[in-house]
Amino acid sequence: MILEILKYPDIRLKKKAQKVHSFAEIQVLIEDMIETMYAAPGVGLAAPQVGISLRVAVIDTSPPDQKNPFVLVNPEIISQKGETSIEEGCLSLPGPRALIARAEKIFVRAQDAQGNPLEKEVEGLLAIVIQHEIDHLNGRLFID
């Protein structure tokens, strides 16, 4: 099911999301978020953007003709290296874009959709999108 994406200045976008404890309860949410992300279209979507205050993000930086969604639950950045800047946009802020400084490489710790531990070092566009989505989970927008 395609979910409604909240638009700025909706106050729910500024709220820090809650940690997920029950993974059985988020399976449909994850499926709906992935469908919503592709329909938007976007490369990432955080649960607070669809009005759900949980630390869940879905990401896909694959070429448009491929679908390889990456799910992060309760993500946290453990370390970061380097700096890069890229012009970012946001599904919750249609239209405006801004040049944002981000870490070039990050080490992220999270859980997958089933609750299994996940640790990954990523760089490039995937690292940038993960940082953007974690900002949403912390109640921050790229214009803040």
Spans of features found by a protein language model:
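Positively charged
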Residues: 1-144
